Amino acid sequence: MVESRRAAAAASAYASRCGIAPATSQRSLATPPTISVPSGEGRCRCHVARGAGRDPRRRLRRRRWCGRCGYHSHLTGGEFDVNRLCQQRSRERSCQLVAVPADPRPKRQRITDVLTLALVGFLGGLITGISPCILPVLPVIFFSGAQSVDAAQVAKPEGAVAVRRKRALSATLRPYRVIGGLVLSFGMVTLLGSALLSVLHLPQDAIRWAALVALVAIGAGLIFPRFEQLLEKPFSRIPQKQIVTRSNGFGLGLALGVLYVPCAGPILAAIVVAGATATIGLGTVVLTATFALGAALPLLFFALAGQRIAERVGAFRRRQREIRIATGSVTILLAVALVFDLPAALQRAIPDYTASLQQQISTGTEIREQLNLGGIVNAQNAQLSNCSDGAAQLESCGTAPDLKGITGWLNTPGNKPIDLKSLRGKVVLIDFWAYSCINCQRAIPHVVGWYQAYKDSGLAVIGVHTPEYAFEKVPGNVAKGAANLGISYPIALDNNYATWTNYRNRYWPAEYLIDATGTVRHIKFGEGDYNVTETLVRQLLNDAKPGVKLPQPSSTTTPDLTPRAALTPETYFGVGKVVNYGGGGAYDEGSAVFDYPPSLAANSFALRGRWALDYQGATSDGNDAAIKLNYHAKDVYIVVGGTGTLTVVRDGKPATLPISGPPTTHQVVAGYRLASETLEVRPSKGLQVFSFTYG
């Protein structure tokens, strides 16, 4: 309340200087105080000068000030930042004074949040660095390390010893320079590439093509020494100490970083969305830097391995010329393969065995809030929270949000836009994807199969292409990528992330299933559970047209290449933390009665009876409360607190455990081997369950 008065006082003080009457005398913290001048009704009397510049009143604050009316752009008022927004329409002036709440978190909490982001980013990058998506660049990285062993190191010295040491140091540092260049260019291009190209009015794939040309030039320079001399000639006028030697490797790393396309995940999605929407803050920069660093460490290992092999194996030392030719050839081959998108076929063929690890480090509520993976809540999308990820039955999650800010369409008559309202009466599947996303490339064959099988039965599919990288904003690239994947259904180009944000999306890929009345009935983030999605599609088609004849399910003929986790991910019961709830009804805070669904998806759980849910866990609120769990593990542990008994039913055999005291871990299954099974847990009234973990 005190802070609100301070903000209002600060706003009123500035308003009185400009002769403006406050629009309201009091506002709550949720609704900031606003002072405005309608167009043409008055001028600001505190006008200082025209032309933008630094405020000469240094005692206030060194911030930009408005050259049209002299308003100071920022003024701190208690816990608020008072921002002045000035617009000029024709010859009339409209000024607005707005008090905006500042970050309410204490300094220690803000530091902790940044450190958490750094840890999450590093772990996410490290997991990405051991994923199949790095395979295309591994040969170049390996040979870049092997090539770092200069032939001069094995020749007899003819000059000064100091020269040999300097050359040896340069060769030793080459792997680090290659990886350093990769980290720098990957981070900069991911965050700033799209904005920079837009400012310069260049094609969105200009950076990619420039990197491909640079990669070919570097490869040719390694093969042909005379060509390398031509490349170095522009630097000949630079003082000798500053010339980049041919064993530097930093330029090679810069080119590789631009072309490096890691597997999509929640952390990379947060970075890409922040860069594309120009919402870059300290947290985004920290997340990007630590993600790039984590992803680079495994690559550095391969580069150092190549260097060590070259040092230890005599054949490498004696054949440095051949090593240079091999490195150049592999570099050029990689560039040619990237032009024709050949590495994607290899990446699709090898399942991403790290996907479940990516999900586990980014599913916590606090982490998801910091990554801003949930998008912006508005009147159109607020009810999407009623849908749980990958539920095995239909849910009701509000009217489907609009397809906003679409910059173009493909695969429609005349490339004209489609309005969702025009599709009422049909079942609609909205599929978020990106053509270079390996996860999407494994999922799209199923979407294509559904479209081909059910388009004559009333199914409409719209692929919303939201780019991960700047070159994916080029319509021609998207069209080519769609053709390679066999996509013939309409594609909406969401280059500005407007529809992505309006749907509060989190992942590539993501599916939103909409019934014939325009209501969202199912949401699935990521790969997998294709049989569940197709079953729900068929159910909605039957609801829309009772008696319609449907073909055989396509999921029986399309192989599921989704990587399977070795164990079921940790199961949380807290509202906001739950990610694998497969039961009926909304999983919201408060007391409610639940029932088991007819079928339960793998690696999910459902509730029965009355439960009281909060942001910590789920409390048994009746004598019939129970949990059904489908899991894949050898051992199962439950974290539970309170006083009572826990009855565990496995294979029809009940076993009772006494529970007493604060929350702690209890083992409920001790298996002999890894298996997929169903378990029922019946906690007595008053026990609070927090999570399941697996071993």
From Swiss-Prot:
It is found in: Cell membrane. One of its GO terms (molecular function) is oxidoreductase activity. It comes from the Bacteria. GO terms for biological process: cytochrome complex assembly. One of its GO terms (cellular component) is plasma membrane. Keywords: Cell membrane, Membrane, Transmembrane, Transmembrane helix. PROSITE patterns: THIOREDOXIN_2. It is a multi-pass membrane protein. The chain crosses the membrane at residues 123-143, 179-199, 205-225, 254-274, 285-305, 325-345. Its main location: membrane. Residues 394-542 form the Thioredoxin domain. It holds the Pfam family DsbD_TM. The keyword Signal does not apply. This is Protein DipZ. It comes from Mycobacterium tuberculosis (strain ATCC 25618 / H37Rv). The gene is dipZ.
